[in-house]
Amino acid sequence: MAGVQSCQMIREASCHCGKLALRCSGEPAKISLCHCFDCQRRTGSLFSVAAFYPRAAVEIIQGNAKGFRRHSASGFDVTFHFCPECGSNLWWEADRLPDLAGVAVGSFADRNFPVPEQVVWAEEKHHWLQLPAELPSHAQNPPQAIPRK
């Protein structure tokens, strides 16, 4: 239709020092909270929260990232991209999900960011941590790939 503009959500994420920034277009395909020990070590926290976007929707708008590749508990390799200055891990690309990039939700610094839709690797969750009971939970990764919205 002539004269009609599409309103697509644009969100920006940045590292702790601000020298590396991303722009994410559209809504995430899925938002997951992960308790795996790898994410606990990577974040220094009890879990990580990732917004999974199509890789083509994630664009570096400032700085250059450094990468670190390793084998994950899911049996696939993952490449983590982080700021070479402050070390913040902004996003990762898992071979298990070849079309998606997981962006660290905390890097958006947006308290109105959508709520996670699922919990993964719940078998490694700290026993005293309480999460909303209505959040679907998987002992490890869900058996199917992340569905597209």
Enumerate the predicted regions with their spans.
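A short Gly-Trp-Pro
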Residues: 2-149
